[in-house]
Amino acid sequence: MSEVLQRITDPKEIKDLDEKELEILAEDLREFLIESVSNTGGHFASNLGVIDLTVALFKNFDFSEDRIIWDVGHQSYAYKILTGRKDKFNTLRQYGGLCGFPKRTESEYDFFATGHSSTSLSSAAGMARAQRLLGKDNKVIAVIGDGALTGGMALEALNDIGYRKDNLIIILNDNQMSICKNVGGLATYLNKLRMGVGYNKLKSDIGSTLDTTSLGKRVKNSLSKLKDGIKKIVVPSMYFEDIGLKYFGIVDGHNIRELNEVLSIAKNIKGPVIIHTVTKKGKGYELAEKNPNKYHGVSPFDLGEGVISKFSSRNYSSTFGEEMIKLAKNDDKVVAITAAMPDGTGLKDFREEFPDRFFDVGIAEQHAVTLAAGMAAEGLKPFFAVYSTFLQRAYDQVLHDVCIQKLPVTLCLDRAGLVGEDGETHQGIFDISFLSPMPNMTIVAPKCIDEMEVILKWASNFNAPLAIRYPRGGDIDVNLKPLSKIEYGKWEKVQEGEKIAIVATGKMVQHAMIAAQKIKEEKNIDILIINATFIKPIDKELLNSLSKDGFKIVTIEDNIKKGGFGEGVLEYLNEIGHKEKIVTLAFNDKFIEHGKPDILYKINGLDAEGIKNTLIELL
């Protein structure tokens, strides 16, 4: 590493660097990021792709006054390093350390927290309008990827920005990827723009030549009237300019000179500007350049060997994908939908085997849910695989388009519960609370991976709205047998016991088993453990029996307490006059920050030791 990065103590110092020093700084950042993220894990390929752009932004703007919003925010590592967080980068995504996304409480340079996609244009427009109303003239910049631009919220914002003529700069970071390869009409359109790069060079070359003479300038002014027609011929449908944005592109996102030139022009233009840069995910690390999907998000790895794929342990996502293929082979009405996450949700092989029955809609959860509703209305059996945190974006569609009509759409909520290092924007701890109040909705959760298979088979013949929630990763080493069959609304006694009954959902049954074993060893008391396969509806018959037999009851869930499973059980037990103690174990009314799940469960009293301590207090 050279001395350039080492000597930067204030981002304003970057403005004084010459072009060669800027290029050296970019290389220093790449070297630092590759070394650091290989040790901590984190978002890798996307960050390597925006380093040159980040350096150019600091050269042209003063972020003690100007504003920048990174859409999704996973590509903000270089920005964090240059804004005083380099020495803390070894704590990235660790409990108490740096967040992997922009966070307003972490730095004065993080102007808006992000984590989910497609939000930057709306927030940037809001900031630009606030600047205008407050009499300020600071620049507002939004950096958004071509994947995030497929999100409906981003398109809504573009429509409004073009109409209102907000004074902001949009930088389209076009790497032809979100996590996986982009799909859809907008991706096709951007590809046409990339193919039409010759138009922009042709326009520049002609303009430069004509500017050299007075006659040429008059000719240039006349030719400018033909600009729209030329665009229609050479570059199909200049969408951005048609809706009111000044378009600059295509710009090489790894050429600092080009970036400086276009940014120096854009910052002096009033009104909305979009700069279309083309970058390469994984730039500077050959293995990531060749396989950007594999290097999107990584665990710690050896730089010489690269990321090694792990095939030894089963997990919920891969099991879901395997079972979906089995269902589809036996039932030609089964279809799978994902919102730009075929690999993460385990549907990659399904896509290969059933391409006509697989639908990747891009980053468009709202569309995905109502698409599924339309399919269900015509007799298909749609399964929408989505991370729990991202289903929040389609609340109205689940309620309005699925539940009101009681359509048999199956929502497969991957990453339900804690996801760990991605932090508060990604923890899947709200789905029980926002789905439970919806009439006609049924919510289930497998207690182990093997039970996932049984539930999916049952779900394929369930004729009403259904949500299946399951966690990231695999099982704890607990000996559990899956249910042999599913009986609607009924729970399962996993272990007989006395005095205290634990009613747990999903993987929390495994935590309960370990806690109960500790009680057995320390107190020689058996704890009754119940697997609440059905989160909604609750098993009232079994609860009546527990109350009649005088059990103290502890509910356990990896969801927030408010509006959760435990509150539903508590409400019913109060209705029937249950006289013994009731304890609900869940996440309290707060957002759960980033860190390893084991640490976060412990801090929140939901690990086996915390559950054991609660049980001891009740004995």
Curated annotation (Swiss-Prot):
Q: Which EC class heads this enzyme's classification?
A: transferase
Per the record, the GO terms for biological process are:
1-deoxy-D-xylulose 5-phosphate biosynthetic process; isopentenyl diphosphate biosynthetic process, methylerythritol 4-phosphate pathway; terpenoid biosynthetic process; thiamine biosynthetic process
The EC number(s) attached to this protein equal 2.2.1.7
Cofactor(s) named in the record: Mg(2+); thiamine diphosphate
User: Which parts of the sequence bind thiamine diphosphate?
Assistant: 74, 115-117, 147-148, 175, 285, 365
Q: Name one GO cellular component term.
A: cytosol
Per its record, the protein catalyses: D-glyceraldehyde 3-phosphate + pyruvate + H(+) = 1-deoxy-D-xylulose 5-phosphate + CO2
PANTHER family to which the protein is assigned, alphabetical: 1-D-DEOXYXYLULOSE 5-PHOSPHATE SYNTHASE-RELATED, 1-DEOXY-D-XYLULOSE-5-PHOSPHATE SYNTHASE, CHLOROPLASTIC
* Family that this chain belongs to: Belongs to the transketolase family. DXPS subfamily.
* Protein role: Catalyzes the acyloin condensation reaction between C atoms 2 and 3 of pyruvate and glyceraldehyde 3-phosphate to yield 1-deoxy-D-xylulose-5-phosphate (DXP).
HAMAP family in the record, alphabetically? DXP_synth
Its assembly, as annotated, is: Homodimer.
This one is known as: 1-deoxy-D-xylulose-5-phosphate synthase
Source organism (scientific name): Clostridium perfringens (strain 13 / Type A)
From which lineage does this chain's organism come? Bacteria, Bacillati, Bacillota, Clostridia, Eubacteriales
